[in-house]
């Protein structure tokens, strides 16, 4: 009887199952994190381009702030950003230095609250509703010389 127990104890049956059970959640979390951060970077690129498009409209003579905001939100919509109306657009007039002189310019800043689809609920579950699950604000600024 003792020899049978010894063989069962030394047997490696089920070791692969335990190793997979320990490593699979970590690999799954790593894969989901890569996908989520890739998605966040794609949204950041769209927000940056929307700020640039807004600056292009803002430098034209006779445009209003509503024209700039409409163009930024239209670009966010075309970039398939969820809820583009949640983005805040700030337009300011400024001066920039060009060589030895200065020129009038328009500065457009776009702030967009980005929520992770998978990681945010997991963070809320693990951390018990702490600030880990709050949306990340993606900001982009574009400044262009007025025409």
Language-model segments: what does each one mean?
Residues 1-13:
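N-terminal leader/signal peptides at the extreme start of proteins
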Residues 2-3, 44, 52-147:
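Short, conserved structural patches
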Residues 13-26:
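N-terminal signal-anchor/signal peptide hydrophobic helix marking the start
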Residues 15, 32, 40:
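Catalytic tyrosine of NAD(P)H-dependent dehydrogenase/reductases that use a Tyr as the general acid/base
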Residues 19, 36, 51:
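Conserved G/P- and acidic residue-centered "switch" motifs that form tight phosphate/ATP-binding loops
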Residues 23-36:
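Alpha-helical transmembrane segments of integral membrane proteins
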Residues 39-48:
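Alpha-helical transmembrane segments
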């Amino acid at each position: 009887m003792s020899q049978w127990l010894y063989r069962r104890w030394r047997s490696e049956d089920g070791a692969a199952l335990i190793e997979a059970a320990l490593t699979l959640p970590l690999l799954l979390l790593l894969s989901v994190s890569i996908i989520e951060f890739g998605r966040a970077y794609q949204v950041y690129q769209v927000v940056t381009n929307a700020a640039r498009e807004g600056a292009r409209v803002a430098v034209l003579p006779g445009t209003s702030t509503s024209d700039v905001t409409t163009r930024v939100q239209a670009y966010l919509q075309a970039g398939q950003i969820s809820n583009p109306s949640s983005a805040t657009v700030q337009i300011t007039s400024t001066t920039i230095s060009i060589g030895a002189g200065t020129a009038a310019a328009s500065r457009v800043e776009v702030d967009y609250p980005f929520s992770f689809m998978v990681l945010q609920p997991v963070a809320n579950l693990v951390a018990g509703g702490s600030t880990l699950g709050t949306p990340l604000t993606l900001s982009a600024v574009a400044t262009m010389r007025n025409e």
